């Protein structure tokens, strides 16, 4: 039987992040992006899980502009990053990353600021409905 000290460093890092995510959530309202936070908090009440997506061409234009890249380099960067994210998420959660069909928040239509506002408004609305016990 293996012990914590025998674990590969990437597993130790994942467990430390997992614990940190729970500690942050225990301290009060927060926004956590990535790091399998939905998985870490799956047994918590009052959690909102959002997968923000946009069509690839919109993402390419945004990343090309932000990092002053050609569209081809931006697309390559996005695809490599997505592959790493999917591999990490799928490995540690035994779920499939980017199941966007479960969500309906598209930053390609709302933009970054609009998406952030939509999430904030959703949480406020949901809290008001919960408080009213409808």
Describe each PLM feature range:
Residues 1-29:
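ATP-dependent small-molecule kinase phosphotransfer cores
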Residues 18, 112-120:
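Short, amphipathic alpha-helical "lid/cap" segments that border enzyme active or binding sites
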Residues 71, 120, 125:
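Glycine-rich phosphate-binding loops of nucleotide-dependent enzymes
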